[in-house]
Structure formats: C-alpha cells, structure tokens
Regions:
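Extreme N-terminal starter segment of soluble prokaryotic enzymes
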Residues: 5-10
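Conserved mixed alpha/beta catalytic, RNA-binding, or beta-rich assembly cores of soluble enzyme
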Residues: 12-42, 46, 52-57, 65, ...
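Nucleic-acid-processing active sites and adjacent nucleic-acid-binding tracks
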Residues: 60
C-alpha cells in the first residue's frame, strides 16, 4: 500500500442506485477513480474523476483493483463483496482497505483492513460526505481506546514488538484491564479521539516509575534501548514505540 495520507482510492458501482450514490461521493472526492458497469457509465457524466467502464463480470476486476488501490469503496451488497474479494486476500499488512456502502447510501461498513489499512478512518469520512452512518466493529474503535498496532502512526512512530505481544496487549486494552502508558519521547499529540483517554490507561513519564505488578501490560514510547532481560521479564505484556529520532514527533 502507498502512503495512507494520500491513498489511491476507487469507487465501484454495479447498479443504478449504487452508481448514483457513487457519483454523489465522487463529486466530493475528485482524486478518486471510478469503476462501474458500462451500463451505468452515463451516471458519471460531468465528473472529472478517471472512469473505467467494464463490460464483463465484476469478479474479473477485483484482482487489478487490489493491485492498484489502497482503498476500494464498493456500492455493492456486503455478501457479494465478501465472495468477490475472498480469493484475493493475503494479510492485513498487504490488503487494501475495503468498504461497502448500501444502495441507499445509509450505511458505510469497513470490511477489510479497517485498522492497519485505514478503512475504518475512511469509512467515517465517506459516511460524513454521504450523510450516512459508519458501522465500525474494530474493538478499539468501538471502545474509543488505544489502537495498539497503529498508535502514533500519524506521527511517524514505529511499533517494536513481536506480533504475539501486539495481539496479547491489544486484548488487555480492549478488555479494559489496567495499562501503563510510559512516554519518554515523542509528541504528546498521540491521542486523536474526541473522547477522553480511558481511565484504565495510566500515564507515566519514566519506565522505572511503573509498579509492573499492578498492570496487565505496558506501552512504552522511548528512544532508549530495551534490554532483552526486560522483554523476557514482561513476556508478552510489552509493546515499544519508536518516535522519529530527528523530530519532536
């Protein structure tokens, strides 16, 4: 995937009403491409968005869409999209964000790569533009808590931890267990939600201040070297974040 700040975006429509909704959205997203059945190409007349009007089956378009785009917004039924994309799935680190919008433009559902791929964030943006309701199911987004795997990504932070640590610590966070958040480096503007930080997240300025026996996990933002014995002592309870060395963030 390319830079999530400037994603390659495609709107896909296969029905009359879906094309109408896609055209409405495309007017607000001039950088988005459009992929539609040739039958409904005229719906997009007057728009400046690049348009691909195909004559065959939508299933033949999915592979190229997955290769070319970072976010794909389908104005297609959820079940159909699941069946169409299934043969093309690789991993959450490689797959594009996939979003589904119903033909009436009432609901926007992130289906694939909601967190790491940015589909959750884009679903909220699409919903806002359409006047629709975003339907998010990612636990940290629904619970308005820390997204362990992508925390600080907008600031250039790099996550340093085995995947099992990220999985275990994410579970502790979304289950509302006590979490120590230690920030020794990086920008203080890492919390971007409109809601307050959950009261289960306790902040510390130094790792040595943390009474480790009181916390299910530790999130540590630092430039310091983490000795192997510390990883071993905390087992799967530690995730480290590395802010850029040459910037305040």
């Amino acid at each position: 995937m390319s830079n999530p700040a400037t994603p390659r975006l495609c709107l896909v429509a296969i029905t009359k009403h879906g094309a109408a909704q896609a055209a409405r959205l495309a007017a607000d997203l001039p950088d988005a491409d459009i992929c539609t059945s040739a039958k409904f190409a005229a719906t997009f007349a007057g728009l400046y968005n690049p348009l691909r009007a195909y004559d065959g089956a939508l299933r033949d378009e999915i592979g190229p869409l997955f290769e070319r785009y970072d976010q794909i917004v389908f104005f297609v039924s959820l079940g159909a999209v699941v069946r169409l994309i299934a043969p093309h799935l690789r991993s959450k680190d490689e797959d594009p964000g996939v979003i589904v919008v119903d033909d009436a433009g009432q609901y926007v559902i992130p289906v694939l790569s909601g967190h790491v791929g940015g589909a959750n964030e884009w679903s909220e943006r699409v919903a806002d533009l359409l006047g629709a309701a975003p339907v998010l199911t990612t636990a940290s987004d629904v619970g308005r808590t820390i997204p362990v795997d992508i925390l600080g990504r907008h600031l250039g932070w790099r996550v340093e931890a085995p995947k099992i640590n990220i999985t275990r610590v994410s579970a502790h966070v979304v289950n509302g267990e006590p979490i120590a958040f230690v920030q020794e480096a990086g920008s203080a503007d890492w919390w971007t939600r409109p809601t307050p930080l959950p009261d289960t997240i306790h902040r510390f300025a130094r790792f040595d201040e943390v009474p480790l026996d009181r916390y299910a996990a530790v999130l540590w933002v630092t430039h310091a070297e983490v000795p192997q014995e510390r990883w071993d002592a905390l087992k799967e309870r530690l995730v480290v974040y590395r802010p850029p060395q040459d910037a305040a963030a």
